Amino acid sequence: MMVLTWEASDKNLLSNAVSLYYASRPEGPWEVIVHGYKNTGVYRWDLPTGLAGPVYLRLEAADKAGNVGRYELPTPVALETGKQRVKVIGVGPAK
């Protein structure tokens, strides 16, 4: 399991605004971790069986107008046994 944490704020976020993704390369392809999740700031990810090597992580947060803010970690996260904690440091406004 890996614990993912983040902060996403917008006065018009959807109730299930957050989607999390992972990829083995920075350009993807991106696989869904969870889609349409509540903006609780924490998700406990049960890693898929056979997932190996470091992964890149992406967070998307959507508002009621359909705008989507996206943040991708610039460096991959190592997958190791034991406790893992990842903190996403921000999502900016959609452009």
Regions found by a protein language model. Give the residues of each.
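Low-complexity, Ser/Thr/Pro-rich intrinsically disordered linker/stalk segments at domain junctions
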Residues: M1-K95
